[in-house]
Amino acid sequence: VLLFSLISLYFSFKYLEKLKLKYLFINFFIFFLALLAKENTITFLAIIPLSAYFFSNYKARNILISIIPLILASVVFLIIRQSIIGTTPEKLEDELMNNPFLGMNFTEKFTTIFYTLVVYLRLMIFPHPLTIDYYPYHIPLVKLTDLRGIFSFLIYLGLSVFIIRNFKKKSIFVYSLLLFIITLSIASNILFPIGVFMNERFIFISSLGFSLAFIYFLIEIMPKIIKNKKVYQATFLSMMMIVFLLYSVKTISRNRAWESSFKLFTN
């Protein structure tokens, strides 16, 4: 999914650079393949023009033209999906395993959703503990008066203010945040229920935004903080080694859980 989405982003920029129709036709098929791989790709309808805005000075008209094949590919995909799958039976929404928010009122539902969005941020920084299944109430019900809910709202309110205030500056951190939020939005339960509170795999594409912000901080921001070149290089290498070692240990330890179906569902 991510591979095809990034290839589509590449061909969008190729069109904007060359203004040749062949890139629009190629992009239609690439984006359609990405949608067939996973429908989360549809969030790149926003990411691609956003990327053009942040990293180029192309005309708005040409940017809009560049996403026409993406829109057409999305329409074709949705028509095919609807004809094969149809709509979800309403009775599924009355089953806890398909609707983890069953029995919650409006404020409880959205406070819990914002809490899960903060959990996603935490997992980006500190991916422990991990699980294959966030079954109903694995994530606790969070009420509006719960400090966890208040804290979650304040975090995303602060991020929203930061995005609004720095959007015109084309800040890399703003782009990274938007990449994280937009690609996660389709699996956030805000737009529509997806049947689970959350899942770690839902932030695979979103992790691109986190990685971009982290690397930008190390390469562009940290040298301005640490003026001494040798100290900066030592700090940079130390931080990269820490990340490499800790994440490698976590990856290897999680691999053991995937040895068999039995181990997977008992870990």
PLM segments and residue spans:
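Polytopic membrane enzymes that build or remodel cell-surface glycoconjugates and lipids
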Residues: 1-267
